[in-house]
């Protein structure tokens, strides 16, 4: 591989496997929403198209590092080692879920593995992650925090307040801005002055005297290179970095279950049905990061096609088991509703 950033072949294969696991998990969730209305409850946001960005970023972590993410959160704990059966049970609202059925799709957490949680409110995980970095600095834990958020969150006041204080205090944090070009039904150029001017969103770092870089979020090795460099800088006491990872979500903004009498329509993708950008969407699908990385590993002799197929088969079996576990687990008892109520 031309630019492996020191990653060994077994690590590259591991990264490919994690990308497959995220994709298969999300495909199982998507199919369950479509084929079994009422089986899954509430709202879910899928990460298909973001697998390379997620895996590349998390590969840069060391044991003890921590992350916070957005509500589009399923992929991160999978990579960190969380049991996908517990995750699927949580999305099903079951007692055996990762959070006992209390959190659902948008509020996952696994503190033991460094996953501090998510935020259902756009941008509000950013100050929480900044606070975690401040705590790590005070405790001298030699720990780095990764904070993930989208392009829409970079317009929130919490984003600017957090970057200011993180730069001022040289906090050990890396801000990973996953720019998927759409904030629900709004293109990034319609709401972001930098994007409208043809600038990368990473230029926002300049206002806070911190480095800002933009990377192809469809290339997990390139993402790893930028995030690992930023993490090393943070760990050395040199403060935060803003990394813009340019991705393209391949599904609609979200999936939601509504009663059939409510006339709501959810598009396949906003690029097609709102903007008519069919070629843009088709080009994004042709650049899908999962088959793209598979082809790269095969071309570089890291992986044989038969090996890749065998890995994919194992992943399908694993996620089929996760769906079965989630569907067949028990619901919480009525008394569980007040289990964690203290006042």
What is the predicted function of each stretch?
Residues 22, 63, 314-321, 343:
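A short structural micro-motif
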Residues 71, 245-247, 341:
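A general secondary-structure junction signal
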Residues 328-343:
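C-terminal intrinsically disordered, low-complexity extensions immediately downstream
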Residues 47, 312, 331:
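Conserved phosphate/pyrophosphate-binding and hydrolysis machinery centered on Walker-type P-loop NTPases
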Residues 24-31, 37-169, 190-202, 207-209:
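Cofactor-binding active-site loop characterized by glycine-rich and histidine/acidic residues
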Residues 115-324, 328:
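Glycine-rich ThDP/TPP pyrophosphate-binding loop and its adjacent helix/strand module
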Residues 1-41, 48, 281, 292, ...:
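Cofactor-/ligand-binding subdomain signature composed of acidic, glycine-rich
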